Amino acid sequence: FCMSDTMAIGAIKAFSEFGLRVPDDISVIGFDNIALARFLTPTLSTVSQPAQLIAEKSVELISRLIHDPSDTENVIVPSRLVQGGTVRRLDGQEPPTRESARESA
């Protein structure tokens, strides 16, 4: 698991240079769901996060903290797994096709 899609792309390149095949030898998952992830071969499995909602909640929290520094809150936002082809399936099924990965994005 990589903390960003960009790092995942770099990891895939590094694994390839060492002769490892993704997903046959090693699985890779990114985080961010950047547009480039859909154009890789295989498509990158990634976690999508609601950037707009995170920005809105951040502004709300900062505004409240300016008025009352003790007004703290933990905010949990939903995330979603976007299945690509960089994770080896343990159940024997084939990884999603480019079309099915695009439909789920």
Where are the regions a protein language model picked out?
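Flexible loop/turn connectors
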Residues: 1-98
